[in-house]
Curated annotation (Swiss-Prot):
Belongs to the HisA/HisF family. This is 1-(5-phosphoribosyl)-5-[(5-phosphoribosylamino)methylideneamino] imidazole-4-carboxamide isomerase. Gene3D superfamilies: Aldolase class I. The gene is hisA. NCBIfam families: 1-(5-phosphoribosyl)-5-[(5-phosphoribosylamino)methylideneamino]imidazole-4-carboxamide isomerase. It comes from Shewanella sp. (strain MR-7).
Length: 245
């Protein structure tokens, strides 16, 4: 499945290179119009990242996210700076279908497991951003990639499997924003090892060939941000390559 994405800083559509706030590109686009266009081209799911909130949780762009969600009929998945049960509940009450939890799942797993028990595994997606070291270990980074987490991807997945983990978005940081192609070997390995989890691929998508390669890897969906913003291809073409379920 194709999941078009936009990243937001202070209400503007942006892209970061490898998660670095110092390497930001701002696009002269309306977030609402951009998401509406993606929906009109056939997207059933849309992914919104609140980068302001990810960096400074007190400045989460909840009002904007509420407006965006209200104006769209597609399913919305939202991440960035979510730290409390109240924030999860608020987003779900605004009509967001799934919240994306990153750093906190690594730092405070018991807290986040409680949210799975309260809201259900369909309502939460874990975002695991990984650095693959020379030994091939998949180490999860935390805090908007500004610091290393030290835990392996597998250890986190196995921990959260106890509460019914269903959705996980995995980004190979070395590919993010690079347009060098996705790490399809990674998604092939994960979907074969953990077939009950719907893996979302992210990072490096540049061409429809990349989309097809991820489709064939066993991943359940693909997050596409930069490639759409710079018109490498459009959502309709991507869905033609990988139709909605």
């Amino acid at each position: 499945m194709i999941i078009p994405a936009i990243d937001l800083i202070d209400g503007k559509v942006v892209r970061l290179y490898q998660g670095d706030y110092g390497q930001q590109t701002t696009f002269d686009l309306s977030p609402q119009a951009q998401l509406q266009s993606y929906q009109d081209q056939g997207a059933n799911w849309l992914h919104i990242v609140d980068l302001t909130g990810a960096k400074e949780p007190a400045k989460r762009q909840t009002t904007l996210i509420a407006e965006l969600t209200a104006g769209l009929s597609a399913n919305i998945q939202v991440g960035g700076g979510i730290r409390t049960e109240e924030q999860v509940a608020e987003l779900l009450s605004l009509g967001v279908k799934r919240v994306v939890i990153g750093s906190l799942a690594v730092k405070e797993p018991e807290l986040v497991k409680g949210w799975f028990n309260k809201f259900g595994s369909e309502a939460i997606c874990l975002a695991l951003d990984i650095n693959i070291n020379q030994s091939g270990e998949k180490i999860v980074a935390v805090s908007g990639w500004q610091s290393g987490g030290g835990k392996s991807l597998e250890s986190i997945v196995e921990d959260f499997s106890q509460v019914g983990l269903k959705h996980a978005l995995v980004t190979d940081i070395s590919r993010d924003g690079t347009l060098t192609g996705a790490n399809t070997e990674l998604y092939r390995e994960l979907s074969s090892r953990y077939p009950d989890i719907a893996w979302q691929a992210s990072g490096g998508i540049a061409t429809l060939e990349d989309v097809a390669a991820v489709r064939d890897s066993g991943a359940a969906g693909i997050i596409i941000g930069k490639a759409l913003l710079i018109n490498q291809f459009n959502v309709a073409e991507a869905i033609q390559c990988w139709p909605n379920e």
